[in-house]
Every structure is written in C-alpha cells, then in structure tokens.
Amino acid sequence: MIHHLRNRRIALLGLGVENHALARFFQAHHIPFSVCDSRDLSTPLEGVSEWRLGDDYLEDLTDFDLLFRTPGLPVLNPNIITARHQGVEISSQTRIFLQLCPAPVLGITGTKGKGTTTVLTRTLLATDTSTRIFSGGNIGRPPIEFIDQLQPDDRVVLELSSFQLQDLDQSPELALILSITQDHLDYHADRAEYIAAKKTIATHQTSDNILIVNQDCPIAQSFAAESPATIWAFSATTPVVQGAWIAAGQLWARRLGEQATAICPLTDIPLRGRHNWANAAAAVAAGLAFGAEETPFAAAIRSFKSLPHRLEHIAERDGIAYYNDSLATTVDAAIAAIESFDQPLLLIAGGASKNAEFSALSTAIARNNVRAALLIGQEAPRIAAALQQVGSGEIAHICQDLPSALATARRLAKVGDVVLLSPACASFGEFKSYEERGDCFRQLVTA
C-alpha cells in the first residue's frame, strides 16, 4: 500500500499533532504530499509539494485525490462533503494506521474514562513480559509514529475519540466501548451523529473479532446486538457471562464457561468513584479478551497511578483537600466526580460551551453535599440558573475566573471540606486546553 501512495495526489488538511506525525511518516517513506492549513505556520516542514495556507485552505480540494483530515475538522464540513461527492478519498492518520498495522489492535472509546481505561489496560497487558505492548491515539502519541516498529505478535492499544472514529471504514480487531452519553455537540451535528461516530469502532468488525461493551449502557448494548463479533462485557453492578464486573466489594472476572475469579477487593483499586471501578472492570475484561492471564492483575491494579486532571488529589492545606478533575468537560463526568465524595464539597465548575444542558448537574449538586458552587466562564450564568430552578440558587457564586473562584472557595471552606475543580465544560476561552486549566489550578493551590 505504501508504494501506491507515492502515485497519489495527497494533501494533509490541518497540520496538528496527528497530521504532523503523518507528515514525518510520509517523508520517511518518500511519499510526496501537500499541506493545507488555516494558519500561517511559523515552522513549516521541508519537502512539502505545495503549501495552501489561509482562510481559504479548504477551497479546490478536488485538485487532490487523497485527503488526510485532522481530527478537529468535521467530516460534515461542506468542502469535505463536496470533495467526497466528486470522488476524492477522505482518510485520516487513524485510518491509514489501521490499514497498515500488522499487529492486532484494541480500540477503546466512550464519552469519558477512555484515558484511564487505556492506560490501565496497557498496564495489565504489560504483565505478560513476552509480548510488546504499544499504545497511543487520543492519549499519548499518534500511532503512525510507531507503525514501522510493529511486528505481528505485538499488541496495540488505542484510545479513540469520536473525531478519530467518525469516518473509518475499518474497525480494530478488538473494540471496547465504555459508557456513551453526550459530548461534543459543539462539533457534531447532533446527538445521533455523535453516537454514530462512536459506533464506527464496531461497525466493520467480523465474526473473528471481539467487541467488549458496557453492560450498564443501553447504547453500548445496542451496538452489541447488531455485531457479528464475539461479545464480552463489563459492569459496575451485575455479573456478566464473559468479562468482568463489580459485586460484593470485589472486582470479578471470568471467561466463557469458566468459574468466576475474584481479581481484587475494591479497596485495592487506587481510583475514586464507582465510575472508576467500572473502568477497572473494563480494563480487566479487555486484558482477558486480548489473551492475558489474570494472575498478575491484582498487583498491577494496586500499583496503578491516577492520571493527571482525573480526580487528581493535589494537596491538603489547613485541613482542606483539593482535587483537580479538569478533564471533566461533560455534565456526566462532573456528576460522577461529585458522587465519589462523602465529604462536603466546594465545587468549581463552568467554562466554555459545549451546548450541554445543566439540569442533571444542578440536581446532582442539590442532592449531594455541595456547600458552594463557584462558577466561571461562559456557562456560569446557565449553571447558576439551573441551580436556581432546583432551589439551590443560594449556593451559586459567579466568579470572574479560576483564581477568583479558588480564592472564594478558600474563604468559604472549613476543615474537612473538599475543593473540587470539575468543570462540566470545555476550557476554551480562559485556557487553551483542559491540561492548562488543571495545571493552573494545581499551581494556584500549591503556591
């Protein structure tokens, strides 16, 4: 396939992280390509056939016959649709990786929990020291960076977002679907299009493949009902026929037709909240489905470290604990964080709009021990209004920015309280990314 690419008229649409990695891959294999980007790039690549930079970079795409879309460029962009209708092939870094990869791939998707589950799954698979494990995708590095290192007996674990999945015509050999709720409605046309993008991870699987689904999620279950693949499952509430689940204070697992095995007590899982117990069950199910033995799983789980910006304990100051959950950019993620604490909470929430509704968040705040809601960003007034509707308007404090929200939280907090940054919103506006927002919170707390 690589040889045939040398005869194509290729353009990279957007030179972000993924397409930059793809450009280096093309350069290494002497494949000519052009770059189209809205930005005036300060450090352009060498050896590019043509540069098309500026606001009109998506014009005249039919000059090419193969386009590699950056994940941030929706497939429903009118210029992309026009090019496709005129016979131009639309691809992506993820798609070409799956086409070229000689090793079996486990793809992991869901609305939240992908990063934690991906890293934990990689940790469990790595207990088999006879096999090399590679991971990347939406977390870590673009997998095209390690494609030339792969051998057929390696294993690959990829975190895949809806942006990366939406136009795939090939599914990974193993697919793991976590909870699917609602996200990125600022990007997708509607909820149905978002769900359809997620479904692509399993759409093209065959009877030789494996699909692992969240038994507690009706949407994931509906994907399984239509799949020809062998079905595995995980659950935070009930036993499964083949996979892993939570029951009686333990994490359990079994293969089809075998007795259930207790992997470890829940107290050994170093992650907060029932949603993270489900993530651990998902990782165990994926590890077993990928052929790993469960004996060393308990030790690997006990030693697992929480990822940054995911209910990350920052510090304790004057009897007050501070947690950074900046990755919680959806309502459901923020609710899961709130429900993971028994202590009184001072919640910092808000940010840029993702067209979310906040009624469920306000209900969760009202039902749990949230003493104050420090609200920031574009969505602060809407969250405050939602709290007013459930009779909790008095706990809302609209703050100018994150530093002022933290200052207010410190003023209101008492010994034994928890100050939790769990925004339920995107970071854009005040910050470039959820990482920058979380890093700012950490710096403010520890200063």
Regions found by a protein language model. Give the residues of each.
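Nucleotide phosphate-binding/pyrophosphate-handling subdomain across enzymes
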Residues: 3-9, 21-29, 264-370
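N-terminal leader/targeting and accessory segments in enzymes
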Residues: 1-92, 96
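Beta-strand->loop->alpha-helix junctions that form or flank phosphate-binding loops
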Residues: 37, 54-55, 91-96, 136, ...
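Short internal beta-strands
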Residues: 32-38, 211-215, 348-349, 369-378
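Residue-level signal for inorganic ion chemistry
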Residues: 26, 67, 108, 138, ...
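Phosphate-binding loop of NTP-binding sites
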Residues: 59-62, 71-215, 219-228, 411, ...
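Extended acidic/charged loop-beta regions that coordinate divalent cations
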Residues: 37, 55-59, 150-187, 221-266, ...
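C-terminal helical cap/extension that packs against the catalytic core
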Residues: 45, 50, 359-417
